[in-house]
């Protein structure tokens, strides 16, 4: 019986699960957005939320505790210098899980796990892509207009 046992097993041993969660946390804090299975995303979300809440104290002991979980010094520096000031006022809910659908190979439900205030990175990329597309469409329209003008000139000459 699983009385008062929280969390998902994820079909792994305890050490493998903790290594997985540490790795997912490091990737999330480094890239601000990761794509993984729904179960891993939901489990990593609770882990990251607790870690960020703990890191908000911002003292030496907490930094050492975070370093024991995240083995990349650059990511830890980024957490304390960039991420915490941006989401420090928030009382919780630092991450969101966006469901994507099934993975092609094994139909596993996929999801995106992202930091809440950092989705502007994705929006910026989408805007750049849209601007590029608009420029291409405008260039194509200009080219078409030139062809029509040339055709009109040829007809007038005849």
List the predicted regions and their residue ranges.
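Structured, basic alpha/beta domains of bacterial-type, RNA-associated proteins
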Residues: 1-153
